[in-house]
């Protein structure tokens, strides 16, 4: 049981404590550890995690790790005992890239390939489409190719191979190198309206909401590194994932938060 008389303020500078003969001093009022956590925690989402690197959202890429201070942005934590939503986000689009490892004559490809268009004044790539899997490819003269529109990882790879085969049949020494999924987009519906104004006020360091410019709230999750578009109707779009599990983890993290801001009629 907590005893106020046992609360001992901790100095912010250990060297100063040693110079004062072991006596600890603090310029701040005495508060318990339980109170300090309540001041620093993000409301309605449980106790924030101080131990993960993701809790320092302002950490620049490539910089050395800095232990999070009490004033550093915190990663909202999902309560461990949160109820399961039973909702599984569905993948809507997968963007992948591949290197054909050869220079390409885009005019020749556009003239001889089916379902291909090329307008260099508008876009410096051939736009090619196939029906199965239903996808679109952007083919650049450098040999780089972007494949978009697939809804499964294996379909994205299969489509990219089909485009590479089309280029090979036109006489180019195309190879299939460095295939990589760059982005996954998923969506779902939580089936209840959401108070976006309250959400942006409580989670302002992670979200932005300007209904005059865009009707959805943009929530930038730190871990996993996913961007969510949250609409008042309850529709949620998740983007920025490299693997499918990141979509699922991000939704499991955000669902208890959305439920706490459910509109009540």
Swiss-Prot record:
Keyword set, alphabetical order: DNA-binding, Nucleus, Repeat, Transcription
Region (Disordered): 1-40
Biased composition (Polar residues): 18-29
Start-end of each Sequence repeat: 91-167, 181-258
UniProt lineage: Eukaryota, Metazoa, Echinodermata, Eleutherozoa, Echinozoa
Quaternary structure, from the entry: Belongs to the TFIID complex together with the TBP-associated factors (TAFs). Binds DNA as monomer.
GO terms under cellular component: nucleus
Source organism per UniProt: Strongylocentrotus purpuratus (Purple sea urchin)
Biological process annotations from GO: DNA-templated transcription initiation
Similarity section: Belongs to the TBP family.
Listed name of the protein: TATA-box-binding protein
Cell compartments where the protein resides: Nucleus
Signal sequence residues: none
A Pfam family this chain is assigned to: TBP
Function of the molecule: General transcription factor that functions at the core of the DNA-binding multiprotein factor TFIID. Binding of TFIID to the TATA box is the initial transcriptional step of the pre-initiation complex (PIC), playing a role in the activation of eukaryotic genes transcribed by RNA polymerase II.
